[in-house]
């Protein structure tokens, strides 16, 4: 068995992780409930601490649920052991069940607290998220968390025991129907722990008288009993091995209780999580008085060692009277309350352990959750700020657009007023111009007749102008052709003059050559005569010089003459042949030049004729283009006149008024 360690619960979640608290002092609920000894021996002495603040709300109301079987009004109460009223409570290992982990605890919490909570064989029972009273269904082991409500002290007084227990007894009888239904009948498999134990326990009035001789309770005891919540159980497992009103103890190795199939609940169910803390706030005096009240039936037990030195039980009482019957009924109720409180204590122990574990897990999770909440809040604040800035920007833009639209609307209104004024002005002008328009129409009709006459004259003048223009163009073309022919003839004349000058130059050159040839021929004739004279002189025997060539001296005279004549005649013939060749060469060169001159003249003549033909064709094309342009202009003018006449007809004029250029009209002689 282990001591339940309760933690103070602050109103605001702490940022630090939950640390292991010291061993707290238990309230007066533990002192009013007779404790059960440990399986191995008596409970060791433990020091008491200052009672912690009560954070859990006291469960108010009457006991719900009833006994299914009746029992005798004054059952025999066997001797039972009494435990001194201590301010601590043991965790009930007998009713520890293998329940799933609490929804508010993490998955790894049982592993983290395995060493710290080694006395528990399984995870704590579930917490119901909705607080409330105990329900009849004991099959599900669930604990409902409740709000914290401290115990309010009642005014001091000394009420009698019937007056102290009267309201609750009346509530029980009112909810159950009758005392016979509460205590009568045999116990069934699903009856409560008090009804099952009451069938085997005799009632000792002497124990009641010795336990509470004055019939009064102290303030702390009364407050403790009055602050106890109503509790309804579906029954506990009856056993013949457990003496008194104690619940069966299975021990650490026997496992959980049997299931609902045997009519026994699996453990305490639907108890408030703050009952143990609220019961710890009562004083020690109430604990001693309640211990005397609840321990009266156990003084007769020979094995009782926790009650201390007390007086022996008195002799059996006489036959029960009304008062004795009332005392019996009240003691039976008190025994039932003791059984209920015992089961409530077990439930509160397990609930407190589960609440401690859940609170420790939640307290460890709180800093992270607070950081997450702070980060989420910061992100939400940033998003809200951004959204607010965006909304402000949109509002500013919409305001600007609204102002701009208002300005545009005002401007449009002004423009509308101006247009309305202009429309009114136009209407007035139209009314004023109506008669003037009629006069203008008559004037236009008169002018249209004059214009038609002027138009006819203009057409005639334009036809004459076109004819004169065509004649002028023809004359210009003829002039151009004449000028071109003149230029051609002048060019031809210049070419002929140049050719003549070239011929003259060639003739001069030829005459100069001929003169030179003649001079050379004269010179050759003179040389020939001179040579003839020399030859005649040579025919005479020459006088030998004083010094002659010995070879010539040996030669005869005839040989000398023949040799001299042969040398002179050979040189002349060579010169004549050379002159003949030069003359033939000059003749051939002159013929070639004459042929080239003739070819060039023919090519120039052909090119001149081709240029003349191209110029004539170009002039003819120019004349045709000019005539075509004039024709197109006339057609365009005719179409424009027809269009103007159609427009005037559409306007409603009697006679169309052709549009005539004023310059042409003024330039035309009427």
Curated annotation (Swiss-Prot):
Residues 329-650 form a coiled coil. Residues 187-199, 242-251, 260-310 have a biased composition (Low complexity). Residues 448-670 are annotated as: Sufficient for interaction with CTNNB1. A motif (Nuclear export signal) lies at residues 632-641. Residues 451-670 are annotated as: Sufficient for interaction with KATNB1 and for inhibition of katanin-mediated microtubule severing. Residues 1-333 are annotated as: Required for centrosomal localization. Residues 1-52, 92-131, 150-323 are annotated as: Disordered. It is found in: Cytoplasm; Cytoplasm, Cytoskeleton, Microtubule organizing center, Centrosome. InterPro entries: LZTS (IPR045329), LZTS2 (IPR028597). Residues 311-321 have a biased composition (Pro residues). One of its GO terms (cellular component) is cytoplasm. Residues 213-233 have a biased composition (Polar residues). GO terms for biological process: fibroblast proliferation; kidney development; microtubule severing; mitotic cytokinesis; negative regulation of canonical Wnt signaling pathway; negative regulation of fibroblast proliferation; negative regulation of protein localization to nucleus; negative regulation of Wnt signaling pathway. Negative regulator of katanin-mediated microtubule severing and release from the centrosome. Required for central spindle formation and the completion of cytokinesis. May negatively regulate axonal outgrowth by preventing the formation of microtubule bundles that are necessary for transport within the elongating axon. Negative regulator of the Wnt signaling pathway. Represses beta-catenin-mediated transcriptional activation by promoting the nuclear exclusion of beta-catenin. Belongs to the LZTS2 family. This is Leucine zipper putative tumor suppressor 2. It comes from Rattus norvegicus.
């Amino acid at each position: 068995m282990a001591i339940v360690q309760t933690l103070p619960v602050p109103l605001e979640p702490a940022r630090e992780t939950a640390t292991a608290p010291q061993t707290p002092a238990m309230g007066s609920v533990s002192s009013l409930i007779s404790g059960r000894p440990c399986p191995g021996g008596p409970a060791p002495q433990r020091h008491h601490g200052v009672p912690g603040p009560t954070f859990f709300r006291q469960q108010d109301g009457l006991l719900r649920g009833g006994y299914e079987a009746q029992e005798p009004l004054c059952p025999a109460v066997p001797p039972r052991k009494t435990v001194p009223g201590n301010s601590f409570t043991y965790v009930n290992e007998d009713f520890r069940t293998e329940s799933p982990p609490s929804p508010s605890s993490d998955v790894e919490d049982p592993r983290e607290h395995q060493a710290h909570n080694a006395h528990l064989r399984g995870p704590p029972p579930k917490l119901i998220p909705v607080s409330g009273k105990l329900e009849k269904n004991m099959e599900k082991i669930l604990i409902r968390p409740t709000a914290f409500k401290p115990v309010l002290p009642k005014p001091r007084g000394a009420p009698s025991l019937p007056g102290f227990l009267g309201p609750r007894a009346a509530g029980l009888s009112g909810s159950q129907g009758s005392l016979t239904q509460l205590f009568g009948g045999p116990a069934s498999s699903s009856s409560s722990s008090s009804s099952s134990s009451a069938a085997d326990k005799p009632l000792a009035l002497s124990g009641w008288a010795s336990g509470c001789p004055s019939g009064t309770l102290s303030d702390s005891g009364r407050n403790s009993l009055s602050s106890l919540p109503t509790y309804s159980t579906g029954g506990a497992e009856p056993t013949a091995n457990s003496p008194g009103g104690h619940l069966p103890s299975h021990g650490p190795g026997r496992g959980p209780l049997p299931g609902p199939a045997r009519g026994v609940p699996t453990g305490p169910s639907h108890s408030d999580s703050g009952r143990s803390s609220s019961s710890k706030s009562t004083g020690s005096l109430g604990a001693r008085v309640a211990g005397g009240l609840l321990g009266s039936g156990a003084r007769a037990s020979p094995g009782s060692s926790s009650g201390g030195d007390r007086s022996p039980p008195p002799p059996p009482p006489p036959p029960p009277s009304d008062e004795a019957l009332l005392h019996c009924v009240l003691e039976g109720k008190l025994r039932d309350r003791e059984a209920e409180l015992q089961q409530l204590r077990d439930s509160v122990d397990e609930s407190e352990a589960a609440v401690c574990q859940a609170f420790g897990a939640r307290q460890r999770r709180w800093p992270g959750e607070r950081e997450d909440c702070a980060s989420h809040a910061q992100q939400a604040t940033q998003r809200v700020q951004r959204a607010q800035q965006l909304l402000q920007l949109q509002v500013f833009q919409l305001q600007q657009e609204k102002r701009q639209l208002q300005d545009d609307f005002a401007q449009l209104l002004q423009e509308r007023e101006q247009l309305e004024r202009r429309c009114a002005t136009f209407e007035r002008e139209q009314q004023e111009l109506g008669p003037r328009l009629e006069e203008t129409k008559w004037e236009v009709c008169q002018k249209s007749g004059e214009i038609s006459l002027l138009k006819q004259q203009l057409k005639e003048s334009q036809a004459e102008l076109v004819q004169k223009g065509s004649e002028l163009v023809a004359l210009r073309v003829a002039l151009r052709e004449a000028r071109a022919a003149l230029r051609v003839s002048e060019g031809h004349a210049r070419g002929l003059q140049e050719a003549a000058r070239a011929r003259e130059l060639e003739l001069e050159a030829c005459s100069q050559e001929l003169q030179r040839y003649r001079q050379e021929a004269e010179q050759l004739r003179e040389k020939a005569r001179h040579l003839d004279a020399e030859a005649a002189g040579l025919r005479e025997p020459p006088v030998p010089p004083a010094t002659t060539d010995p070879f010539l001296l040996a030669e005869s005279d005839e040989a000398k003459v023949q040799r001299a004549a042969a040398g002179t005649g050979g040189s002349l013939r060579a010169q004549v042949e050379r002159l003949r060749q030069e003359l033939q060469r000059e003749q051939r060169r002159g013929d070639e030049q004459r042929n080239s001159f003739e070819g060039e003249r023919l090519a120039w003549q052909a090119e001149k004729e081709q240029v003349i033909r191209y110029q004539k064709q170009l002039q003819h094309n120019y004349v045709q283009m000019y005539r075509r342009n004039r024709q197109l202009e006339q057609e365009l003018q005719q179409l424009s006149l027809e269009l103007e006449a159609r427009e005037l007809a559409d306007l409603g004029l009697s006679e169309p008024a052709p549009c005539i250029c004023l310059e042409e009209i003024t330039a035309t002689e009427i």
